[in-house]
Design a protein with these regions (language model features):
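Aspartic protease
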Residues: 1-6, 10-102
Length: 102
């Protein structure tokens, strides 16, 4: 399932479409997209491993960066923590816990 959402920054409001993933334990955003939006990007103190759906380690990538953003879906606004990585064509993945909280 996908959902349309807005990212609020000091300078602008950007529209994006996110994939809602019932198996995701965290929120993710495409690092290239975050750089394109000129979002604040922060390094993680310790890089984190990424695991595939079958619970094997993803050897092509690890999490090194994050950003904290204000986002809006419909009339609901929230502050979310996104880990930044390569998501291919996807702009963002919203976790199951986010979905249940809205």
């Amino acid at each position: 399932m996908t959902i349309r959402f807005y990212i609020h920054t000091i300078a602008k409001r950007a529209k994006a479409i996110a994939l809602v993933d019932s198996g995701a334990t965290e929120n993710f955003m495409n690092l290239t997209y975050a750089r394109w939006l000129r979002l604040p990007i922060h390094p993680l103190e310790q890089p984190r491993k990424i695991f595939n759906v079958n619970r094997t380690e993803n050897k092509s990538s690890e999490l090194k960066y994050y950003t904290d953003l204000k986002v809006q879906t419909g009339t609901t606004r929230s502050s979310l923590h996104f880990f930044l990585t390569n998501l291919g064509e996807n702009k963002a993945i919203l976790s199951y816990s986010w979905f249940m909280a809205t």
